[in-house]
A protein has these predicted regions:
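Conserved ATP-binding/catalytic motifs of P-loop helicase motor domains
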Residues: 1-207
Length: 207
């Protein structure tokens, strides 16, 4: 599973919301009454249990599950992981974390962060120290084993790898800038050249 549709497609999986029949919105990890704040609805353990609907086939998949892989975990919100944990415990009728299923988290925490609206965070901050998956109450109580993969397979140029790592950690040097500037072509003519890729920061600029 994965937090977003694109990430799920890339992993040949499904989204967390689809797999566990979770409504969109924020999740408060207790049994308090649901709240509405402007345009945001807050689910709780009570509302999820009351409105929970899942077909028999999906329940069987979850009850027979031994290992669940969650990809692109940098985008996984703490409250969504707690909601998933609650649903797995409910379906499997097992009070162990994630209903006793082993969870494998995969991702790069320096990539895209979770998306949490300001109005959501004003409520969620009363329950969480942060927005990332490792701030989820289930992982605060039961910390996972972290394994860092250090070998780079996509690049072979050591200088380029060094530049990328410095950019990744916000430690860019003058030497890195000089290396990148070697490939700058200020006289490049867009009209006279075809087949190039133009990267922008926003969709509006790309359009």
């Amino acid at each position: 599973v994965a937090p977003t549709g694109i990430a799920a497609l890339n992993a040949n999986g499904v989204t967390i919301h689809s797999m566990f029949q979770l409504p969109f919105g924020a999740f408060i990890p207790d049994h308090s009454d649901p709240q509405f704040f402007e345009s945001t609805k807050f689910e709780t353990k009570s509302t999820l249990k009351r409105h929970f609907k899942m077909n028999g086939v999906k329940k069987a998949v979850i009850r027979n599950m031994e290992l669940l892989i969650i990809d692109e975990v940098s985008m996984l919100r703490a409250d969504l992981l707690d909601a998933m944990d609650f649903m797995m415990q409910t379906v499997r009728k097992n009070s162990f974390p994630f209903g006793g299923v082993q969870i494998l988290f995969i991702g790069d925490l320096l990539q895209l962060p979770p998306v949490v609206k300001d109005e959501e965070w004003r409520i969620l901050r009363n329950h969480y120290r942060g927005k990332f998956f490792f701030h989820a109450q289930v992982l605060v109580q039961f910390p996972p084993l972290y394994i860092e993969l250090s070998h780079i397979y996509r690049q072979t140029d050591e200088r380029f790898i060094s530049v990328l790592n410095h950019l990744r950690n916000n430690q860019i040097t003058n030497q890195d800038i000089a290396t990148l500037n070697q490939f700058v072509k200020p006289d490049f003519d867009l009209r006279a050249n075809k087949g190039f890729i133009c990267l922008t920061t926003h969709n509006a600029k790309a359009d």
